[in-house]
Amino acid sequence: MSFNVSATADASNTAGMAKQYAYEMDKAMKEWSNDAEFALMRSTVISTSGSALRSMTSLKASITTNATSQSGVSLSENTLNDYLGTAWDQGGNPDEVYVGKTLKRRISGFTAGNTKFVDSTDKRLVNAVDVYESDFGIIKLFKHRYITQSGDNNLDIVGIQSDKFRVATLRSPQHVSLAKTGDATKGMIVGELTLEFLAENSSFKGTAHL
């Protein structure tokens, strides 16, 4: 994630910021984090070659054992419990479910126990998070913008046993100065991470829902 700022822009008195370069660096760091989140959820593994950078296997791509294509079937409460049961039969115990906005609203309409709470030890839970009481235990429901995106032809759902997945960081994101050319200062944000999945059959994935 690279950026550059002209000397004129950096020297100017810009409202709302002390220095243009610092602002662009902060913005690039946020974009890097956003790209990393996208890759963790949706990327497909690619080996390094002359024309392609290496990439990791994402959360969606890593779940293969308990992966079901529903071919246009609407997500129901029974279907969700079937997903959880399939993972349970494989020795898993999913405790988190990730969906886009449409399936999140559908699950919120289920008749089973559905409440809200805040767990102060879980730093992801800034606001109250929905909790679904399933036949296989209590599940945290997370609305995630990259599960389903504009342009996708289906709606997907992913449920994981959270202690079987983790982000492994090789290099934390950091600012690196680039060689100056002309009347501009250049920099980039660089970092390396990957997704570790210890037992993907502990989790489930349902695709192609209406």
Task: Describe each PLM feature range.
Residues 1-210:
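Flexible, glycine/threonine- and acidic-rich loop/arm segments that mediate assembly and lattice contacts
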